[in-house]
A protein has these predicted regions:
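Residue-level recognition of single "structural anchor" positions
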Residues: 1-354
């Protein structure tokens, strides 16, 4: 009697016990990512529910709620705003608006992006142009920044700042000749351009970071050069609950800030790790992870740095989740918001200080 032929499912299940630990993890990740594509319709519904979470449609242009249906176009439902008289769909003002690529490709791009791939490698994996890969990344980051928000803190808050060198990448045109003594488009000779100032100067940008014991994180650009009190106050005012405890190093400005915002201030002296139960080790550890994260990109233009800080914040929020969950959350959050982002705005943007 002939043996019954194994089904594809039975063949796969019989091979799983023979896999090494690394191979099993690869297969498990592949299955998880395939599961996302199989349930793309559910993700699209979740995007719609998140976008209209208040129970009513909102105009992406004027944000009015007097909306009526306005027929369909290529099977896609259109809506009309009675206030501004503009027509829109569920995709209007999302990163994928006007894109001719499929949602599956956008999900694949998100997987590459969250895996830390460079813009060039993302383009190769998704078979898109490098320029397209660049603009997709920044459209997604703009949307994630809108969804994640600035952040509010309470209770015991650790605060500190870290510095990145000001990067003017993309702010000037290239010159053909770059020989000795030839001036660059920044007005300096190439020999002068190589020189870097030591210590804190206008060539460095201060990034403020604050973390409470509940895991809430506030991060953003404060100012260029040495930390200035008006910029420090602007960064924290309205984002730390009254009577919270602010734990910092011996940097100037935090004592005055605590008095004005009605906070309890604990100062950790230089050279000491902690004071009683108070310390800033969590925020120092965060700085280490941030530097590692940024080092993978080999120099980010300062005008785009705020978006990369929000990307880091997204990773911190979902660091305990599975890879597939991170991709799903990134897709829903980026597609459910109304970021004011276009190719023109990305090209002409300047550094945004919180």
């Amino acid at each position: 009697m002939a043996r019954k032929k194994k089904t594809a499912k039975q063949t796969i299940l019989s091979l799983i016990p023979k896999l090494s630990k690394y191979e099993f993890e690869e297969v498990a990740q592949f299955v998880e990512l395939s599961h996302i594509n199989f349930h793309l319709d559910n993700l699209q519904r979740e995007v719609k529910e998140t976008r209209y979470s208040e129970g009513q449609y909102t105009c992406p242009f004027c944000h009015d709620t007097h909306i009526v249906k306005n027929g369909t176009q290529k099977g896609v439902q259109r809506y009309l705003c009675r206030q501004c008289r503009k027509s829109f769909s569920d995709q209007t003002a999302t990163p994928s608006y006007h894109s001719k690529k499929s949602p599956k490709l956008w999900l694949h791009y998100l997987r590459c992006m969250l895996s830390g791939y460079t813009i060039r490698k993302c383009a190769e994996e998704c078979q898109i142009n490098i320029a397209t890969s660049f603009f997709w990344r920044h459209k997604i980051l703009d949307a994630l920044a809108t969804a994640i928000g600035i952040g509010d803190l309470e209770g015991l808050v650790e605060a500190d700042e870290t510095f990145f060198r000001y990067n003017r990448k993309g702010n000037f045109t290239k010159v053909r000749s770059y020989k000795k003594g030839v001036r660059t488009s920044t007005g300096r000779t190439n020999k002068q351009a190589k020189k870097k100032k030591r210590g804190l100067s206008r060539d460095q940008v201060a990034v403020g970071t604050a973390l409470d014991r509940l895991g809430n994180l506030k991060i953003g650009l404060i100012c260029t050069g040495r930390l200035q009190y008006p910029a420090l106050k602007r960064f924290y005012e309205g984002h730390i609950s009254v009577n919270s405890t602010l734990c910092t190093d011996s940097a100037h400005g935090y004592a005055t800030l605590s008095d004005e915002l009605h906070l309890n201030h604990i100062k950790i002296e230089s050279g000491k790790r902690k004071k009683d139960i108070y310390h800033i080790q969590h925020i120092n550890s965060l700085h280490s992870r941030l530097k590692d994260f940024m080092s993978d990109f080999k120099g980010v233009a300062t005008k785009h740095l705020q978006n990369y800080l929000y990307w880091f914040k997204f990773i911190e929020i979902f660091k305990s989740e599975r890879e597939s969950i991170k991709i799903e959350r990134a897709y829903v959050l980026s597609q459910a918001n109304y970021p004011d982002c276009s190719v023109a705005s990305i090209r002409t943007r300047t550094a945004a200080f919180v």
